[in-house]
Amino acid sequence: MNEELQNQFMALDVYNQQVDKLKEELSNIDMMIMELLRSIESMEGLKSSKEILLPLGAGAFIKAEAQNPEKIVLSVGVDVLLEKNVDDVIVDFQKSVEELEKTKELVNNQIQKTNQEIVKLRSELEKRAAAIEQRSAQMKPKTN
């Protein structure tokens, strides 16, 4: 197998790895979007009821009542908390969802482009394999 053919097989492998990484990134983006949407839904719910479920860990919750549901405390860094109005946080989270949706679109476009390269490269490799087979068949001695 010549060096160019080896390089094409390696490129095909790299493209497949890139697609896998991009799909993993898409999955992470989807999880972030879902978490933000759940948070928005919970904050919207505070407008009609002060009762919340407070997570204790390992799937355990306790019912509690929000003392000041108009204010949300956000973690904005290591040991840094910021208090904001609930409506402002909802707007911020909605903007984050929009940005993540744009990022998701870019990642999907990159996956599509990479898949096109994979198809193109596979086609070239199939043509080369067919040509090698044909040459190999022509070189075999004929038996009578």
Swiss-Prot record:
Cited Gene3D superfamilies: 1.10.287.370
Native source organism of the sequence: Methanococcus maripaludis (strain DSM 14266 / JCM 13030 / NBRC 101832 / S2 / LL)
This protein's UniProt keywords: Chaperone, Cytoplasm
Function: Molecular chaperone capable of stabilizing a range of proteins. Seems to fulfill an ATP-independent, HSP70-like function in archaeal de novo protein folding.
GO cellular component: cytoplasm; prefoldin complex
Organism classification: Archaea, Methanobacteriati, Methanobacteriota, Methanomada group, Methanococci
Family: Belongs to the prefoldin subunit alpha family.
A GO molecular-function annotation: unfolded protein binding
NCBIfam families in alphabetical order: prefoldin subunit alpha
Self-association state and partner proteins as the record states: Heterohexamer of two alpha and four beta subunits.
Location, primary (coarse class): cytoplasm
Protein name: Prefoldin subunit alpha
Superkingdom assignment: Archaea
One matching Pfam family: Prefoldin
HAMAP family, alphabetized: PfdA
Biological-process GO terms, alphabetical: protein folding
Compartments, record wording: Cytoplasm
